[in-house]
């Protein structure tokens, strides 16, 4: 969890695949007070909890540099906000999986042109 003192709220987050170099968190919502881990688990399970503004699961993420990594150079944050609901009903309100995959494919093609690899070619073809 991380605090936002400006609005006096606490961001509720859960690990979504962190490793030694990167911290990958899913934003679950926010609350005005620190919550017990059992209450956070209820939010993760989709239960409504008084005093918590919950976000739809799988829509909000943050990737940041892990300052404890031996390879750490400088801080950065990447925020990902994915589409919440069908565009015909909700309008375009976030990135789609397809858009993110296009970015990854584009990057892999560039990397493969610089550092040819059979693994890159397999990833591009998949």
Residue ranges and their predicted role:
Residues 1-96:
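Long, non-catalytic architectural segments outside compact domain cores
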Residues 80, 92-111:
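Short acidic, glycine/tyrosine-flanked loop/strand segments centered on an H-E-D-like triad
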Residues 102, 108-126:
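Short, compact, well-ordered microdomains
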């Amino acid at each position: 969890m991380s605090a936002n003192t400006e609005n006096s709220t606490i961001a509720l987050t859960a690990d979504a695949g962190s490793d030694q170099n990167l911290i990958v968190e899913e934003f679950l919502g926010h609350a005005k007070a620190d919550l017990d881990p059992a209450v956070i688990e209820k939010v993760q399970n989709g239960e409504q909890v008084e005093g918590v503004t919950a976000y739809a699961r799988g829509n909000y993420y943050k990737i940041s540099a892990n300052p404890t990594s031996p390879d750490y150079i400088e801080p950065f944050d990447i925020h990902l906000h994915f589409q919440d609901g069908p565009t015909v009903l909700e309008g375009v309100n976030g990135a789609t999986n397809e858009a993110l995959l296009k970015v990854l494919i584009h990057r892999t093609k560039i990397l493969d042109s610089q550092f040819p690899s059979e693994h890159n070619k397999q990833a591009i073809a998949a």
